[in-house]
Amino acid sequence: ILFLPYIFLLFQATFMRRFEEFHDKRVRIVETFEAIEKYKEEIECLILIDDYVGSGDTLLGCINLIEEKGIKKEIIKSITLVVQKSGKEAIEKYGVDLYSAIIRNKAITDNYNKEDAEKKIQQMEGISKKLKVKNKSLYLGYKKSEGLVTMIKTPNNTFPFYWYEGKRDGKFMMAPFPRRNNVGVDE
């Protein structure tokens, strides 16, 4: 999970100050588990911020690490820009509230009748085979998420034709939306 202080600073400055509940509260922006541990006695609410939640596995792993530091899950909240419906359900089933601007269904399974969905799933698996995606479990995205989203670093919950890069016929194939994080703005 990525704690995004620049987004949170904007959120704090423009939104949180409008609410009476925050007038007398100290808002800390932290990026490390060590900082969470350092201030754990003061934490009344811990807000985790991420750009995307797919299956929920990464967020649940982060929550588990935070719980190991002595923070109870009841005070943890998560805010994300985009979430897969199945990921939201997994997080909320665990007992953590998740708020998102956009909730995404599975691109095929949740948008077609069973017969049409099965055909389209086979087509998508065929595309993944042609791309020579090595891990068959990723043919429909991680945990069969069937995601249709891209960010600076495209999540592996999306269909592999978005992000998969490999060699085909001895030539390197570039993805339209790679998972590599080798291009960015330095601070």
Which ranges hold each PLM region?
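Generic enzyme active-site microenvironment
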Residues: 48-49
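Short, glycine/charge-rich flexible loops or terminal/linker lids adjacent to PRPP-binding catalytic cores
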Residues: 4-45, 54-61
